[in-house]
């Protein structure tokens, strides 16, 4: 896939899954990713805060091999060098990480650059500085980070969709029970962490979320 084809996945009611071993009920990231990919997910973000860089490299390399088999995208959280080394499709950076222009210069034009945003100002700045997609949240209360940002609510999704012309990935506390609220406010790409990785049956949970997204895309309410 070229970059344009890859970015089209962010605009087509797809599920964007992040790894989080702390919440995966003792299961390894690689095993969680395998189940998620088997269920049909096309976008994976490798986010791992606690392991050594060697451990992250070894794990990300295996996940890259898996995503390639499934023709899925691999986005690396934070680490530009790791993204480049394992030949990921992109990197996701936060407000306090490397500037977008630095990431672009280091990784090249074909890499996807995603940026976390919490406010309207940050959304506009991300667009103006050349982010390929925006992670917008947390929409609802979320506790996967040590210092969670307060929830920003649903209305900003609709505002962002109408004010910038790059994909918006809604993230933060999104679950099967509230996903319709997020979709109704204009989100076309939904990120989930604990709703997926903490499920007893990751495959079935993921399949059900995908079914909801596809149903919404096709104009059917399957709730």
Curated annotation (Swiss-Prot):
Co-factor binding details: Binds 1 Mg(2+) ion per subunit.
Transcription as UniProt keyword: no
SUPFAM superfamilies named among the record's database cross-references: Thiamin phosphate synthase (SSF51391)
Recorded GO MF terms: magnesium ion binding; thiamine-phosphate diphosphorylase activity
Residues that coordinate or bind 4-amino-2-methyl-5-(diphosphooxymethyl)pyrimidine: 45-49, 77, 116, 145
GO cellular component term, pick one: cytoplasm
Domain of life, source organism: Bacteria
Keywords: Magnesium, Metal-binding, Thiamine biosynthesis, Transferase
GO process terms (BP): thiamine biosynthetic process; thiamine diphosphate biosynthetic process
CC cofactor: Mg(2+)
EC number: 2.5.1.3
Residues binding 2-[(2R,5Z)-2-carboxy-4-methylthiazol-5(2H)-ylidene]ethyl phosphate, per UniProt: 142-144, 173, 193-194
Classification via Pfam families: TMP-TENI
Pathway in which the depicted protein is active: Cofactor biosynthesis; thiamine diphosphate biosynthesis; thiamine phosphate from 4-amino-2-methyl-5-diphosphomethylpyrimidine and 4-methyl-5-(2-phosphoethyl)-thiazole: step 1/1
Reactions the enzyme catalyzes: 2-[(2R,5Z)-2-carboxy-4-methylthiazol-5(2H)-ylidene]ethyl phosphate + 4-amino-2-methyl-5-(diphosphooxymethyl)pyrimidine + 2 H(+) = thiamine phosphate + CO2 + diphosphate; 2-(2-carboxy-4-methylthiazol-5-yl)ethyl phosphate + 4-amino-2-methyl-5-(diphosphooxymethyl)pyrimidine + 2 H(+) = thiamine phosphate + CO2 + diphosphate; 4-methyl-5-(2-phosphooxyethyl)-thiazole + 4-amino-2-methyl-5-(diphosphooxymethyl)pyrimidine + H(+) = thiamine phosphate + diphosphate
Binding site for Mg(2+): 78, 97
Alphabetical list of CDD domains matching this protein: TMP_TenI (cd00564)
HAMAP family: TMP_synthase
Function: Condenses 4-methyl-5-(beta-hydroxyethyl)thiazole monophosphate (THZ-P) and 2-methyl-4-amino-5-hydroxymethyl pyrimidine pyrophosphate (HMP-PP) to form thiamine monophosphate (TMP).
UniProt record similarity statement: Belongs to the thiamine-phosphate synthase family.
The protein, known as: Thiamine-phosphate synthase
Source organism per UniProt: Dictyoglomus thermophilum (strain ATCC 35947 / DSM 3960 / H-6-12)
